Amino acid sequence: MPDGDQARAQEPLRVSILRHGGHLVASVHTALDDSQLLRFRHELVDQIGRYRARGVVVDVAALDVIDSFACHTLRNLAQLARLRGAQTVVVGVQPDVAMTMARLGTSLHPVPTALDLEEGLGLLDLPDRRGRA
């Protein structure tokens, strides 16, 4: 691994993962590169098992770009969470980000989305968790 990549791998992720009842809330505070996205996915899936979380909210409100790799990683994260017994909701997609994603044909589908944390937590507590996806 080149020195720059190794240094980035050692950097703390700018993501906070907090417990909220039986759920985890992961707030992404700044853009993550591909290797950081993969570390985030690994760490979150690990915490789902550690805390026996039944639901996960991923808050992306701070992001001004969600590229195709980030979409793929979030979809994969939701699939891994589902295999571990937890549902996932992505919240906080900004209007400009949503318009760009639609223009480029990228999507978070089938991952449910919600406007904000409150709505996302509400979706996790519903028996039918389809969301806006």
Language model segments and positions:
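Non-catalytic signal-transmission and effector/linker regions of two-component phosphorelay proteins
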Residues: 1-19, 129-133
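STAS-typified acidic loop motif
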Residues: 13-41
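Hydrophobic "anchor" residues on beta-strands that sit immediately upstream
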Residues: 23, 55-57, 112
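Expand to "…catalyze enediolate/carbanion chemistry for C-C bond making/breaking, isomerization
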Residues: 40-44, 118
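Amphipathic alpha-helical interaction surfaces in cytosolic regulatory modules
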Residues: 51-54, 58-107
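Short acidic-hydrophobic, aromatic-tinged amphipathic segments that line or gate anion-handling sites
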Residues: 110-120
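A cross-taxonomic marker for long C-terminal extensions/tails that follow the last structured domain
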Residues: 118-133
